[in-house]
């Protein structure tokens, strides 16, 4: 069995949501269910109806909610794949020594 020493990198996670969006709510619930496993992830939920949300939607060209932004890169818009999301977090978290 191989053993790796690594430090977990800090990851920025922004969910750009809109009021009444069921997929946004599903992502929030999913995130809450796995959040304890990812202490290195800084999660922020921003409403698209705020000035900050409007600026992010414009910057990342997000036309449907939720917009999932990971480390300042658009991961998905209008939906999300749980498995791909976790793979992305694992890839970004690992910093081999």
Regions found by a protein language model. Give the residues of each.
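Local sequence-structure signature of Cys/Sec-based thiol-disulfide redox active-site neighborhoods
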Residues: 3-37
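Glycine-/small-residue-rich active-site loops that bind phosphorylated ligands and cofactors
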Residues: 19-23, 49, 77
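Secondary-structure boundary motif
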Residues: 33-40, 91-94
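Thiol-based oxidoreductase modules, predominantly thioredoxin-like and allied folds used
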Residues: 40-53
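Structural micro-motif
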Residues: 59-69
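Non-catalytic, surface beta->alpha helical segment in thiol-disulfide oxidoreductase systems
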Residues: 70-97
């Amino acid at each position: 069995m191989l053993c790796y020493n690594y430090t977990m990198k800090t990851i920025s996670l922004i969910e750009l949501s809109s009021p009444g969006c069921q997929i946004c709510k599903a992502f929030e619930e999913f995130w809450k269910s796995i959040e304890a496993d990812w202490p290195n992830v800084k999660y922020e939920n921003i409403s698209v109806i705020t000035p900050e949300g409007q600026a992010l939607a414009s910057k990342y060209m997000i036309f449907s909610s939720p917009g999932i932004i990971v480390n300042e890169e658009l991961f998905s818009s209008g939906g999300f794949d749980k498995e791909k999301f976790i793979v992305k977090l694992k890839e970004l978290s690992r910093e081999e020594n």
